Amino acid sequence: MSAPFEERSGVVPCGTPWGQWYQTLEEVFIEVQVPPGTRAQDIQCGLQSRHVALAVGGREILKGKLFDSTIADEGTWTLEDRKMVRIVLTKTKRDAANCWTSLLESEYAADPWVQDQMQRKLTLERFQKENPGFDFSGAEISGNYTKGGPDFSNLEK
């Protein structure tokens, strides 16, 4: 079994004051830098379909309404190397046309260049999923790739 698309092609991160976030077709990843030596019991993390909240040692780091809905039961968080919290959210709408422009409705928006790169990456990931025999991890894309690229579903095979 080959590695996931994002492992082969890299990710397009959106930097924030507390770390970064990035997305794939199916998931949104949030990486929060916390003080070294942080213990799991120091972390309070609430994940709901449209809301996320994270506090470390009683200090609120992240809280708000998500850009779009997620599957609450599939959201997870982990503490890695006692210095980073990784939150993984599963998107409700899992297609290339659903490229989040920001993490929260009013905060942590990707700048126009990062947004463009995210849309390109999701479109390539879509092509990879539709054509598993090809490797699009090193491919470049230009032209019509916004909203997931062209729709070929009605073409005859």
Curated annotation (Swiss-Prot):
GO terms for cellular component: centrosome; cytosol; intercellular bridge; kinetochore; mitotic spindle; spindle pole. Its main location: nucleus. The modification Phosphoserine is found at residue 142. The keyword Cytoplasm applies. The keyword Protease does not apply. Residues 14-104 form the CS domain. Pfam families: CS (PF04969). The modification Phosphotyrosine is found at residue 145. It is found in: Chromosome, Centromere, Kinetochore; Cytoplasm, Cytoskeleton, Microtubule organizing center, Centrosome; Cytoplasm, Cytoskeleton, Spindle pole. The modification N-acetylserine is found at residue 2. PROSITE patterns: CS. Residues 134-157 are annotated as: Disordered. Keywords: Acetylation, Centromere, Chromosome, Cytoplasm, Cytoskeleton, Kinetochore, Phosphoprotein. May regulate the LIS1/dynein pathway by stabilizing LIS1 with Hsp90 chaperone. PANTHER family: NUCLEAR MOVEMENT PROTEIN NUDC (PTHR12356), NUDC DOMAIN-CONTAINING PROTEIN 2 (PTHR12356:SF18). Interacts with LIS1. This is NudC domain-containing protein 2.
